[in-house]
């Protein structure tokens, strides 16, 4: 089964080494998100059926393109439900692709883009119990990895013995791979803390999902350590919620974008930025956050760019001076408007 080889999602279906690009559903399961230009992508069409079809279209394009890892969360609106209906309608069997989801945030926007609060964080045992049941009701045996959503030192989840014991039960019964995701300026600290947590003499967490991109590289060394210790490493926000695309109109970013565009040699500059993440030797899966088929196909092009000699290393050299301090990056990230 897939869970026995967590670094090789969907290997039976790809005829060899699986594509390292995955698909995240944060921008596809709800009307509002913080990606730059998200409202333009959806074009004001927020009807649930329309959004479900859009999600299915992107999932179809991902499957055709060789993607075999899909990531959702309880707080991504109807992302799990949309994924479940796609799996059923396309008759995908459990194990055909890796499915990861998350618990710890509750969606509260009521299908509104302008809600005062879009999600509420709660890492309690009660939330784990409730949301695990909800995820399993939708995804059943398709669910492979269940992750603590945005674990931080402040939330206390990594010191909550009741939660950790409950996660150990999931690990020990073999039903799920237990993972965590990280956010914020202390990602590296959290990743290393997760590496230390054990139950019954064995590491509890088998996967970690963190933000890494050309603007926010601070978790890289810790993720390399996690990879070396055998953890599945998933990269999210490789395009910095659109800040590493042409939608970033900040004049201060213009020189960096011009150089990325030059490096892309006729392709979109974001392809080079995504390829930089794909070329990390410790990154097992890099999630695309595409909300349209067109963006998904452009992201797929980065899988060939990542293998181009010298391309991504040059991008890193050029952008080193534009890399932000973690505190600055996450301050900007928190200020991105829901749209």
Could you describe each region identified by the protein language model?
Residues 32-53, 113-129, 154-157, 185, ...:
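Active-site mouth loops of central-metabolism enzymes
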Residues 134-156:
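Active-site groove signature of glycoside hydrolases
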Residues 150-339:
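Beta/alpha (TIM)-barrel catalytic core signal, keyed to glycine-rich beta->alpha loops juxtaposed to Asp/Glu
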Residues 94-125:
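Structural motif corresponding to the early beta-alpha repeats
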Residues 23, 62, 70, 83, ...:
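Conserved, mostly hydrophobic/aromatic
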Residues 16-21, 66-69, 92-97, 140-144, ...:
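Short, well-ordered coil/turn segments that N-cap beta-strands
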Residues 1-102:
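N-terminal binding-site loop/beta-alpha segment at the start of enzyme catalytic domains
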């Amino acid at each position: 089964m897939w869970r026995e080889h967590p670094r090789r999602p969907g290997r039976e279906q790809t005829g060899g080494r699986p594509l390292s690009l995955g698909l995240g559903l944060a921008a596809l399961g709800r009307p509002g998100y913080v990606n730059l230009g998200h409202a333009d992508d959806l074009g004001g069409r927020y009807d649930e059926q329309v959004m479900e079809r859009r999600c299915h279209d992107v999932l179809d394009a991902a499957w055709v393109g060789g993607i075999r890892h899909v990531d959702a969360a309880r707080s991504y609106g109807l992302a799990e439900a949309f994924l479940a209906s796609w799996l059923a309608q396309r008759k995908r069997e459990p194990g055909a692709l890796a499915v990861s989801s998350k618990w710890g945030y509750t969606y509260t926007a009521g299908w509104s883009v302008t809600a005062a609060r879009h999600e509420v964080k709660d890492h309690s045992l009660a939330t784990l119990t409730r949301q695990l049941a909800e995820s399993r009701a939708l995804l059943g045996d398709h669910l492979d990895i269940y992750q603590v959503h945005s674990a931080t030192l402040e939330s206390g989840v990594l010191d909550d013995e009741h939660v950790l014991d409950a996660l150990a039960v999931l690990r020990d019964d073999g039903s799920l791979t237990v993972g965590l995701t990280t956010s914020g300026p202390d990602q590296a600290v959290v990743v290393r803390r997760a590496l230390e947590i054990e139950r019954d003499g064995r590491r509890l967490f088998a996967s970690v999902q963190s933000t890494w991109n050309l603007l926010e590289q601070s978790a890289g060394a810790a993720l390399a350590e996690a990879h070396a210790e055998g953890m599945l490493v998933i990269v999210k926000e490789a395009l910095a919620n659109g800040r590493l695309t042409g939608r970033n109109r900040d004049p201060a970013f213009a020189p960096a974008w011009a150089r990325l565009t030059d490096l892309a040699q006729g392709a979109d500059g974001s392809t080079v930025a995504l390829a930089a993440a794909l070329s990390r030797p410790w990154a097992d899966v890099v999630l695309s956050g595409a909300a349209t088929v067109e963006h998904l196909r452009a992201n797929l092009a980065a899988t060939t760019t990542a293998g181009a000699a010298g391309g991504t290393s040059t991008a890193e050299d050029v952008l080193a001076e534009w890399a932000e301090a973690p505190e600055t990056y996450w301050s900007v990230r928190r200020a991105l408007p829901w749209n």
